[in-house]
């Protein structure tokens, strides 16, 4: 009887000890997980982290930016309409030599447009290129995204598609277009985009025939010149309070391009790209170079791999310069928390316009970057000037 009592007491003590150890292990595991969770929140935030709506557009057209911003302010899930409004505003305001300005015809004197829009939530993309007869090309690009299973439509077929959906056909070429084109023809069609043909394209208008391959000179590629107020592509990026991105671009194409040419504004990842899980990017510059390297896509993927927006922007521009030493252009990068950065090269100065962001009262503020040929300044979400590199965990929008 005594032996049974001792065994029972021993069993009870063992059970109590095991229970105590189990509680201790669970407690330690809880606090360990709590510390890990707190660390993750500190570094990366949570789904409930407050995001301030943000509207960014390339170059310094503040009115178009404000019109897009007014749409974004109406509430969540207005990013699509906001970027479209920005593109249409620039169409109507004749931003630069863009769109309705009529001063960017192809080598036959015809004005064509291209545009694209991308949804960062579903990674859906719609674009048109080399399209005649439709003034608001961004509306047609949006229709490609929403009503078809395709991504890009081009040329007269894109115009036919627009007409089938009820968009009014308009003759875009005007007196200014003809005047600019005639002046270019009288100057021997200089500059143009031909090479390794005869007669020499540096002196003649053509028609051209190919040179035998052994006569190809492969001269150093001269980049397409981009100067303030003389660019032909604009891009808009919108981020709402729910962390949803839309990006869009619209262009009238490189001046005096060969007919049929598709530009960066219509190519996924060249002029625009967005992924809600990571962020978004817009690029501007020599479109043929941008199409070869897809800088907007590269910038987003660089952030996915762990780079901060300022690091991603600078890395992309430096990569472009390694292969195209005369490249002129810029990239603006935004992560999923609304932290933005930009880098440029080959220009005297690059401008982009920002509305929104945490702590900012001034809307449509113009950010300016002084650019170098091989090294770029980096703007890191702040006032104008030179900006230091700051650790990611401290890179919160400053008020």
Curated annotation (Swiss-Prot):
Keyword annotations: Disulfide bond, Signal
Disulphide connectivity of cysteines: 90-95, 189-205, 344-371
Gene Ontology MF terms in the entry: N4-(beta-N-acetylglucosaminyl)-L-asparaginase activity
GO cellular component, one term: lysosome
Keyword Disulfide bond set for record: yes
Signal peptide from the UniProt entry: 1-22
Pfam families: Asparaginase_2 (PF01112)
Family as reported in the entry's similarity comment: Belongs to the Ntn-hydrolase family.
Protein name: L-asparaginase-like protein GE13669
Source organism (scientific name): Drosophila yakuba (Fruit fly)
């Amino acid at each position: 009887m005594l032996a049974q009592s001792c065994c029972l007491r021993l069993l009870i003590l063992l059970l109590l000890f095991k229970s105590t150890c189990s509680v201790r292990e669970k407690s330690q595991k809880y606090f360990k997980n709590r510390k890990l969770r707190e660390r993750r929140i500190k570094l990366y935030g949570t789904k409930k982290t407050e995001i301030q709506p943000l509207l960014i557009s390339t170059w310094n057209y503040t009115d178009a930016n404000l019109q897009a911003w007014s749409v974004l302010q109406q509430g969540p899930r207005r990013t699509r309409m906001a970027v479209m409004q920005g593109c249409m505003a620039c169409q109507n305001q004749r931003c630069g030599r863009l769109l309705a300005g009529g001063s960017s015809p192809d080598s036959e004197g015809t004005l064509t447009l291209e545009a694209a829009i991308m949804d960062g939530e579903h990674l859906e993309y719609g674009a048109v290129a080399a399209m005649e007869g439709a003034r608001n090309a961004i509306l047609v690009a949006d229709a490609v995204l929403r009503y078809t299973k395709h991504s890009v439509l081009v040329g007269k077929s894109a115009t036919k598609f627009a007409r089938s959906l009820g968009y009014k056909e308009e003759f875009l070429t005007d007196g200014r277009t003809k005047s600019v084109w005639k002046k270019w023809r009288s100057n021997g069609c200089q500059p143009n985009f031909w090479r390794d043909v005869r007669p020499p394209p540096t002196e003649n208008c053509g028609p051209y025939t190919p040179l035998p391959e052994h006569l190809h000179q492969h001269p150093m590629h001269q980049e397409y010149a981009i100067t303030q107020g003389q660019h032909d592509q604009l891009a808009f990026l919108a981020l709402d309070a729910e962390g949803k991105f839309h990006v869009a671009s619209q262009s009238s194409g490189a001046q005096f391009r060969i007919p049929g040419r598709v530009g960066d504004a219509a190519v996924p990842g060249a002029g625009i790209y967005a992924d809600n899980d990571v962020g978004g990017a817009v690029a501007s510059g020599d479109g043929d170079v941008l199409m070869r390297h897809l800088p907007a896509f590269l910038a987003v993927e660089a952030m996915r791999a762990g780079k901060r927006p300022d690091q991603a922007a600078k890395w992309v521009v430096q990569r472009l310069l390694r292969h195209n030493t005369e490249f002129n252009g810029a990239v603006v990068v935004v992560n999923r928390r609304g932290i933005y950065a930009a880098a440029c090269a080959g220009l005297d100065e690059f401008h982009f316009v920002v509305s929104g962001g945490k702590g900012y009262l001034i809307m449509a503020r113009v950010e300016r970057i002084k650019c170098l040929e091989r090294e770029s300044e980096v703007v890191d979400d702040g006032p104008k000037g030179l900006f230091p590199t700051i650790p990611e965990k401290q890179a919160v929008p400053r008020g």
